[in-house]
Amino acid sequence: MTYIVTSEFELNQVAAPNLPLAPVQYTPQYIDQLNNVLRLYFNRLDAILAQLKVGVGDIDGSGIRFSYGAFSDLAYTTLNGGINNSVTTITVVSTTGFPTAGQIRIESEVIIYTGTTPTTFTGCTRGARGSANVAHSTGVAVTKIQSPVANTAVPMYMNTTDFSNSVTLVDTTKLTAAKAGLYNLQWSGQFNNSDTTEHDLSVWLRINGVDVPASTGFVAVVSSHGGIDGHLIVGWNYYVQLNAGQYVEIWWSTTNEKLTLECYGPSTGPTRPSTASVVATLSFVSALP
């Protein structure tokens, strides 16, 4: 089986040459026809090397593009005005990147909201997930969090497509493959524990809504200490078999609602960039066995 790189830098099968039948007696026309068929075939094969080369004599496969997708979850803003401990509409600089309903953290307070406008969170439930409802000053950070009820299975959500070719993010949780194959799924999560006790979480996979056997991993996240929340970034990889159009999701649960997945905005002392709560990549490895 022979393949050729198309103008889109993807490998497509090249059909074997359709050689003309040889006549009983030699004819110049047959030789010309045979030469033309073979010349066309080998010219197409030469195109493989021509598009894979990055320099004179170099062949490293850099011209090939396989199926892949890289996705993350990141949303943060700041308060646009101070708030007391009871208001249910919170004004911020922007709600871009936040879901229409979800959870946010302002300092140590977790808030559940049911709606958004371009600059407000509405229908807020203050002091959620065991936190205290308190007043906050203008300009403090507001970050998106993922915080399930204790011992409840939920998927990990993502809101950003960083890179994609034939692998897409559907409904904020489903890493969907357009082409069948064996894929490498790599993920990491930034976990936050605001409780004074260490808590556990578990992470596993579902393919098309069905739990994948032997995919669960268990992690313990350290407790808060010295007034600072416990933090832990964890991750590992899986090989998954997907048919065309199938999707894989990352699911998790925690033993305590004070253990959350959290984004963070840029920080100082020293200056550091923002932090995504979830990062996941799905990369084609091979055709199905």
Model-derived features: positions:
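Autoprocessing Asn-cyclization modules and mimics
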Residues: 57-146
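Short beta-strand-plus-loop segments that form exposed binding edges in beta-rich domains
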Residues: 251-257
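Beta-strand signatures of extracellular beta-sandwich domains
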Residues: 112, 202-206, 249
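Terminal (often C-terminal
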Residues: 51-73, 113, 143-198, 207, ...
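Extracellular and analogous surface-interaction loops
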Residues: 92-96, 171-182, 238-244
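Short, surface-exposed tryptophan/glycine-enriched loops
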Residues: 226-251
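N-terminal low-complexity, intrinsically disordered "leader/linker" segments enriched in small/polar
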Residues: 2-65, 69-70
